[in-house]
Amino acid sequence: MQRSPLEKASVLSKLFFSWTRPILRKGYRQRLELSDIYQIPSADSADNLSEKLEREWDRELASKKNPKLINALRRCFFWRFMFYGILLYLGEVTKAVQPLLLGRIIASYDPDNKVERSIAIYLGIGLCLLFIVRMLLLHPAIFGLHHIGMQMRIAMFSLIYKKILKLSSRVLDKISIGQLVSLLSNNLNKFDEGLALAHFVWIAPLQVMLLMGLLWELLQASAFCGLGFLIVLALFQSGLGRMMMKYRDQRAGKINERLVITSEMIENIQSVKAYCWEEAMEKMIENLRQTELKLTRKAAYVRYFNSSAFFFSGFFVVFLSVLPYALIKGIILRKIFTTISFCIVLRMAVTRQFPWAVQTWYDSLGAINKIQDFLQKQEYKTLEYNLTTTEVVMENVTAFWEEGFGELFEKAKQNSDNRKISNGDNSLFFSNLALLGTPVLKDISFKIERGQLLAVAGSTGAGKTSLLMMIMGELEPSEGKIKHSGRISFCSQFSWIMPGTIKENIIFGVSYDEYRYRSVIKACQLEEDIAKFAEKDNIVLGEGGITLSGGQRARISLARAVYKDADLYLLDSPFGYLDVLTEKEIFESCVCKLMANKTRILVTSKMEHLKKADKILILHEGSSYFYGTFSELQNLRPDFSSKLMGYDSFDQFSAERRNSILTETLRRFSLEGDAAVSWNETKKQSFKQTGEIGEKRKNSILNSINSLRKFSVVQKTPLQMSGIEEDPDEPSERRLSLVPDSEQGEAILPRSNVINTGPTFQGRRRQSVLNLMTHSVNQGQNIHRINAASTRKMSIAPPANLTEMDIYSRRLSQESSLEISEEINEEDLKECFFDDAENIPAVTTWNTYLRYITVHKSLIFVLIWCLVIFLAEVAVSLVLLWLLGNAPAYNKGNSTISANSSYAVIITSTSAYYVFYIYVGVADTLLALGFFRGLPLVHTLITVSKILHHKMLHSVLQAPMSTLNALKAGGILNRFSKDIAILDDLLPLTIFDFIQLLLIVIGAVAVVSVLQPYIFLATVPVIVTFIILRAYFLHTSQQLKQLESEGRSPIFTHLVTSLKGLWTLRAFGRQPYFETLFHKALNLHTANWFLYLSTLRWFQMRIEMVFVIFFIVVTFISILTTGEGEGQVGIILTLAMNIMGTLQWAVNSSIDVDSLMRSVSRVFKFIDMPTEEGKSTRSIKPSKDCHLSKVMVFENPHVKKDDIWPSGGQMTVKDLTARYLDGGNAILENISFSISPGQRVGLLGRTGSGKSTLLSAFLRLLNTEGEIQIDGVSWDSITLQQWRKAFGVIPQKVFIFSGTFRKNLDPYEQWSDQEIWKVADEVGLRSVIEQFPGKLDFVLVDGGYVLSHGHKQLMCLARSVLSKAKILLLDEPSAHLDPITYQIIRRTLKQAFADCTVILCEHRIEAMLECQRFLVIEENNVRQYDSIQKLLSEKSLFRQAISPSDRMKLFPRRNSSKHKSRPPITALKEETEEEVQDTRL
């Protein structure tokens, strides 16, 4: 960043904002980079501002029982705030004085008052000076208030972030991500722009009193008629506002429904394509869009009338003020023109400034109170440590996640009177839930000496992670004592990777030790992985480590924990994502050798780990089931296997037992007490929750097996559009903005630079922060991501674009002592953005405008209609000129008033009186037409938005995966949310305002030019100057806005990253470091925002300077030109003053239109995406059967020409090569093999070898070369949908969209209920579905969060059965499954797919033994393809993975079936008394 010219700028340069000229010049000539942005002043740095506010807040906390945040803010910012308020008031006073001088100038043209005529020139000078004074007061005041608002936002941003790092885990579990994002965006954004309006709460009333005093002098009591009309108008607009809010509230829910489905579609686009659901998803989304647009039109019409009422009220205000006075006394032109000028100022004060100011105060005080409540939440308390102790002791410890744990689950109760769901009845789903007082850990005791290894085991949800949390101090014990030294290192169960390099993630701010670092890298098996990267360990990782496999992330997290020199190491299931070979090696080299002298607590379920542990603690339902050595365990607890693995023999489970497990799953429900829904209303059966940080928690989601524990949570994040999940009392009139999203689906909120409007999209169910922290990367069904490319393949991510990472990137110095630097260099700055650097011009091209106008044919005719109505209004204005020109002739002979003023009377009892009313009648008719003229325009522009949304949705669904892989899920979602909302809401009315303002200016210039042609000569250069200024400013401002929007991403990325790794941060004591990084991100955003505010003020001031010069010229031309009557002078000066404000408004509106049209450009960019190669141009709706006609079928013994295809499932792969991107590196090369019909083939290979990629290539989801034939039919000879229909797919990432069970199983509605129930029976889903009200019509939301992962896998299995596919692709179907569901899947595969070809990618040896042949993939190629017997007899990866005991036990069983052409699946393995070993490959 460059040093700011502001530091050395003179007073005049600061006053006129001339110091911004270098950046404006540079932005006009070339594209701006972050290196071009100026450094922020030290007074604006987050460090200084946060320290200042934190000091005052601490003072407030210490001195009062009821501390008020507003008092702390007042002590920090009050005097500057008031100073700029006084400047603003003085500037506004000049507006009230200007009409007085205008009236005196008009009066000076009285033919009988020659003295007054001689001072007209001085009055003109005075009037021009008032404009100059106003300009010099108003712009510094507005900028100063914007600046203070920015500083307040920064200070509170920092204060909130620091508080977040201190919050207790109990509090975090009650706060949703949406609430935090809302707190840091919607609420704080109110200060940026709102502060400039806040002073009008007292300025506007004073101004009204001053203006009414002046109008009383002119019109006496009749002046209050105009004021009364304005008050009625303000109340009318308030009513329209409430009506608009009602429509927006209704519409927000519809928008949310559409965006939920859209985001699920985007995030799971690969599954959509694999299932051939493109048409079904398109139809589903379009139906929701239709409902949404009905409400959108209603809201737009109300907003249109609200806006039009202001524009057309000016005539009636003047008319109602003047008419009573004229009827009684008659009126002269001077009073009319003076009244017009007064009423313009009065109208703005009453209908705009005062209501806006009141709303600003209401919103700001509400935001301050929310922040104040948040800042007083309970904080995390560290335990008291004994630094001298060398042992870890826990004595009789009991703990609750909150007092009286056992969440008060909301049970369903159907009220027979009002059909509402209410809380309190525990009879519908649950029985015997005596949950109050249920502890998460009960009476736990153990003691381990220094250097010992304690293995903690237990079933899912037994309390293992809670035990580690209690040692770390995250969970406070209610009874008992804990003793240890306090020097802790921690490795989370779910890998946490911060954006940055591998080295940064491992060192994590600890001083660098080369030998220790290399030892840790080696022990954690990271050497080979690091060697593959060109930058080695300095490669920049994306948010959440998206560029890495799950195993690599797990090893880096482990390496971070091991690198820190601590007394106690807490390792929470660190081997969950590792293949069995890597796991064995790391356990031996790292845990057993490298850490041999350290105290270790390892959470594990592996038998070999228990054998090598010094002590074993087995937990069961929160209690200590066993504590001792392994030999004692075998002797004392021979039944420990079932407690360890979490299940007994599957065959011992009755249907009732399995249903009771489902009942545990149903505890995931929470019902909103006031939701007026009926169980029978299918669209309203989604269980909603409020986002309240309130008295009752409504988001408790517990695991589905045997437990009420806290940390077995697999919960899905709801869509929080605009990143917002507001409190129930939050106004729904919100800025429309999207938050970057994280890997877990949180949002990032872009903020408009002026005043944003738009709906809030509320999530249906809130995601607590605690659940985010305990959320598995692989288990999470993400809705949209913040800073990472979407992984749209089954498991392996394509190489990410490393130019889009966060500010953490490359922060290690290259010196030998590698402390993490706290400086941000320009390389870092380039990598901090969310959105791709858009290839969109700084200024919207004319081609975009032309294409937008021609989207809908009638739009051109609507524009012509508006122009015709405008020309009619101009004609009426010319009639007025004629009346004014002839008024003296009428009045000379018939006036009843004094001769001194008879020359100027236009309303008398003579014929002129009637002529005037004829004019009024014509004017009213045209005003009525003008009032409605924009309605067709708004209606048509919304229709254009509808068409563009449809085209973009179709384009995205038909785009190839190589194109979609190059984009981010969050970026695509922004097009459907933020950009479509702009097309729906902002663009139509902004275009209407601009056209209307432009026509008003043209009309006023035309009238003035007719009266005084010389003025037209002065008008031309002014308009040309405005156009040049606009073009000059627009190039820079749009780039600065883009940089500011992008610079906001690191703030929210850092917030979500910190939340996900909060336990790790605390364990490592890195809160200060992360606070520093957060301040750096804030400063980066501030630099862009401050520069944008400064350049905007430069532009506004230059526009006003040009106008002041124009007004001076007009004034002196009018005054110095002889022979002018007071009527013409009054019209010229009044219109000139009106032109000033209107032309400025029009120029600003044109800039807004250009800015909003960038959304149209982005939408067109998506519409123009390529479609999948070979995609049929006609619509292909999947049918039950696929008959091949006119398709070349290769000779194949397994298929007949007339058969339904595919009939056998024989598959031949020839020279298959696959790439993620066009021209990219080959991920698979020259793969060739053949599969017989009905054969089962297992895919083997280490993590990242390409197994899942091969399955994607079969479905043509990648760029592929070579050929695949199924039953003799080549993939080149049929459409993509026909090809993909041949496959049934159970992906690693399960896709459950928001909709009914029926829709999820059969989105095309091809099958009857009987057929669906039959399949549900086959896969074991019937008992699950029947538990829900509505059964097949029950609405699943949030990725089916009420279902366990196993139930979701069964849904995928049911889809495959319904598809009648002959080839089944399974990508790690047993990952994260409970044992029961796993056995159901195995049984279903045996029964429902007995005659199908199965290709299985799996880590569990037990599952792989069902296969007849194995395909071993290494280094992108097929290394081996043979039977299990052959692989076991040779040196192979399979032989390395399987133990000798398993080989001896399992080989004969497999060998006995080798003579059969297609052996049946081995009978389900009964649970024995032998050791249970979860062996995975």
Curated annotation (Swiss-Prot):
Assembly and interaction partners: Monomer; does not require oligomerization for channel activity. May form oligomers in the membrane. Interacts with SLC26A3, SLC26A6 and NHERF1. Interacts with SHANK2. Interacts with MYO6. Interacts (via C-terminus) with GOPC (via PDZ domain); this promotes CFTR internalization and thereby decreases channel activity. Interacts with SLC4A7 through NHERF1. Found in a complex with MYO5B and RAB11A. Interacts with ANO1. Interacts with SLC26A8. Interacts with AHCYL1; the interaction increases CFTR activity. Interacts with CSE1L.
Catalysis: reaction(s): ATP + H2O + closed Cl(-) channel = ADP + phosphate + open Cl(-) channel; chloride(in) = chloride(out); hydrogencarbonate(in) = hydrogencarbonate(out); ATP + H2O = ADP + phosphate + H(+)
Residues the record lists as Phosphothreonine modifications: T717
Function: Epithelial ion channel that plays an important role in the regulation of epithelial ion and water transport and fluid homeostasis. Mediates the transport of chloride ions across the cell membrane. Possesses an intrinsic ATPase activity and utilizes ATP to gate its channel; the passive flow of anions through the channel is gated by cycles of ATP binding and hydrolysis by the ATP-binding domains. The ion channel is also permeable to HCO(3)(-); selectivity depends on the extracellular chloride concentration.
GO MF annotation, one: chloride transmembrane transporter activity
Compartments where found: Apical cell membrane; Early endosome membrane; Cell membrane; Recycling endosome membrane
Name of protein: Cystic fibrosis transmembrane conductance regulator
Motif PDZ-binding per record, residues: 1479-1481
Record field: transmembrane: 78-98, 123-146, 196-216, 223-243, 299-319, 340-358, 859-879, 919-939, 991-1011, 1014-1034, 1096-1116, 1131-1151
Residues modified as Phosphoserine: S549, S660, S670, S686, S700, S712, S737, S768, S790, S795, S813, S1445, S1457
Lineage, broadest ranks: Eukaryota, Metazoa, Chordata, Craniata, Vertebrata
Residues that hold ATP 1 according to the record: W401, G458, S459, T460, G461, A462, G463, K464, T465, Q493
Glycosylation sites: N894, N900
